[in-house]
Amino acid sequence: MQFERADRVAEEIKKEISDIIQHELKDPRICAELISIVKVNMSKDLRHAKVFVSIFDKNRENITSTMKALENAKPYIRREISRRINLRFSPEISFELDDSIEYGARISQILNQLNIAKDEEEEKSQDESEGEQEN
């Protein structure tokens, strides 16, 4: 599959934004346990970048404050992107919270609970049938 230029630029922007967030942003409002850039969607003209951010933290307030800090850091991140990547125009950045990983983990947890309940039920019925055979 041949990548379009927008896809290649999106992947490069994803790497650079991850690096900037991990190593250069010193905002105390970024207090989440783990921040991950999941995906970057670029417009065809490369002027707009929608950055999907996944934030792992049990406290909703930390997630909100981290998103506000990222919004406030947009001018700095945009400037750094233009410095690091050679593009004609520095893309306008918008951050979107992506909770799909958290949602998937929750579904996985529910499925595991169902499997545990099913296993316990099978063990109980097996124990009952063994008890009947002894009589």
From Swiss-Prot:
Q: What is the official name of this protein in its record?
A: Ribosome-binding factor A
Has keyword Cytoplasm? yes
Q: How does it assemble?
A: Monomer. Binds 30S ribosomal subunits, but not 50S ribosomal subunits or 70S ribosomes.
Query: Which BP terms does GO give this entry?
Result: maturation of SSU-rRNA
Asked if the keyword tRNA processing belongs to this entry, the reply reads no
Task: Give the GO molecular function terms.
Answer: ribosomal small subunit binding
Q: Where in the cell is it found?
A: Cytoplasm
> Where is it mostly found?
cytoplasm
| Function in brief | One of several proteins that assist in the late maturation steps of the functional core of the 30S ribosomal subunit. Associates with free 30S ribosomal subunits (but not with 30S subunits that are part of 70S ribosomes or polysomes). Required for efficient processing of 16S rRNA. May interact with the 5'-terminal helix region of 16S rRNA.
Q: Which UniProt keywords apply?
A: Cytoplasm, Ribosome biogenesis
Q: Quote the InterPro entries the UniProt record gives.
A: KH_dom-like_a/b (IPR015946), RbfA (IPR000238), RbfA_dom_sf (IPR023799), Ribosome-bd_factorA_CS (IPR020053)
S-S pairs: none
CC per GO annotation: cytosol
Give the family this protein belongs to, as stated in its UniProt record.
Answer: Belongs to the RbfA family.
- Which source organism does the UniProt entry give? Caldicellulosiruptor saccharolyticus (strain ATCC 43494 / DSM 8903 / Tp8T 6331)
Q: What Pfam families does the record tag this protein with?
A: RBFA (PF02033)
Q: Which HAMAP family does its entry note?
A: RbfA (MF_00003)
| Matches recorded under SUPFAM superfamilies | Ribosome-binding factor A, RbfA (SSF89919)
The UniProt entry, under Gene3D superfamilies, shows: 3.30.300.20
